């Protein structure tokens, strides 16, 4: 399973998403707006493949599932 979490600093739900995945014993790749995209949202949106406004955004096996609430639902 490939998990990518798109995040930004000071994002409570980004931290919750990362902790949820860690607590499930799964590995993930984090892509940070500031570190990986030079704080340019357009570059991040291009990588995500969809115009989204909320963070985090999560891809599982290269499919965008949405944000934190969708991540919780995915693993229920």
Q: What does each model-identified segment do?
A:
Residues 1-31:
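Local sequence-structure signature of Cys/Sec-based thiol-disulfide redox active-site neighborhoods
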Residues 10, 33-34, 63-64:
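Short beta->alpha junction loops/turns
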Residues 12, 39, 66:
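Short alpha-helical
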Residues 33-52:
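Thioredoxin-like thiol-disulfide oxidoreductase module
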Residues 49-59, 68-69:
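Structural micro-motif
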Residues 60-76:
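Non-catalytic, surface beta->alpha helical segment in thiol-disulfide oxidoreductase systems
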């Amino acid at each position: 399973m490939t998990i990518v979490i798109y995040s930004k600093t000071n994002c409570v739900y980004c931290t919750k998403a990362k902790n949820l995945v860690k607590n499930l014993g799964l590995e993930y790749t984090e892509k940070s707006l500031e570190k990986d995209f030079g704080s340019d949202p357009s570059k991040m949106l291009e990588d995500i493949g969809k115009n989204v406004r909320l963070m985090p955004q999560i891809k599982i096996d290269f499919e965008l599932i949405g944000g934190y609430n969708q991540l919780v639902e995915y693993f229920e």
